[in-house]
Amino acid sequence: FAPNHTYDKNTFAALKNSGINEIIDGYGIMPYEENNIKFIPQLFYKVLMLPFGIQSTQIHLNYWKQKDFDNFKNFIEKNKNKILSYDQALNKINNNYKLINLLTKKIIQIKRIIKKD
């Protein structure tokens, strides 16, 4: 992902020049396409199942203890019918969710700013 999860014209140009056209990052509740690059949103750094939408989760296994692995296993078992493959998520791209994705982005950004202070 780009520094601070921001994608400007230079970042998009660098990605395209590098042949990268799919990214797991970004804000929103549904996969989307921007500047001919497909995004699967990555909103959280912990395992969390939203009641709607599609998103990926960032996890750092190198910091996990056995309890974390056990919790993750339980999460997968509990939510296995809701978990999609990467390709299945990409096939759900629908730019009709642009407004909802934008609102999600702004809400999360504001929440993170407030949390810092």
Task: Identify the meaning behind each predicted range.
Residues 1:
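Acidic beta-strand-to-loop metal/phosphate-binding motif
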Residues 4-117:
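Terminal accessory/targeting
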